[in-house]
Amino acid sequence: MAERILAHSCSFAEIMRYCFAGIGDAAFRYRLRLAIEREAQLHSCFLSAGHRKRFREGMSLVRKTEYSLIAQLYLLSAHDALWQETRKVLEADGVVYSAMADAVSELDADAFELYLAASVWEYGAVSADYADLTDEEAVSFDVFRVICYAVPIGLYGTDAIKISERRPAKQKNRKRKEGKERE
């Protein structure tokens, strides 16, 4: 799969299915399928234009390009208030989690879940397992999506994001034809 990702010859849906192939929990698989479908509809792994903008800002502020840091920035930039706290402690070589712990505890549940997921990429300690992500009351669908999308980003870097934002060839050709007809 790594070769196909480097060549951009697969879809984001294929990457997601590959990353989560070992999880058989029916509730998780159902939410994952919905997350994959949403990405296919939007042609983006970002929740919004604001999420994309905050992520790109974060990427421009760090020197490291380690995939785990890219995943952390992706997670932390998904929530505006969380991003504002992150910017205060973002350094050229990463995020200083200890400096933002108190501020994050004041944010809403979604921000806190994203913070915990990002810290897993930093420290490697899993504070929750995939079964916790299936609880719709504890983890909103958007947070579930972002956490799941962060996995291929953490494994394959910005190539996963580029694949996510790639438009299907049919759609590209249709836009080209529409542009020529207008001329």
Predicted features, each with a name:
Residues 1-106, 111, 122-170, 175:
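Extended, charge-biased low-complexity segments
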Residues 178-183:
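Non-Sec secretion/translocation targeting segments of pathogen effectors
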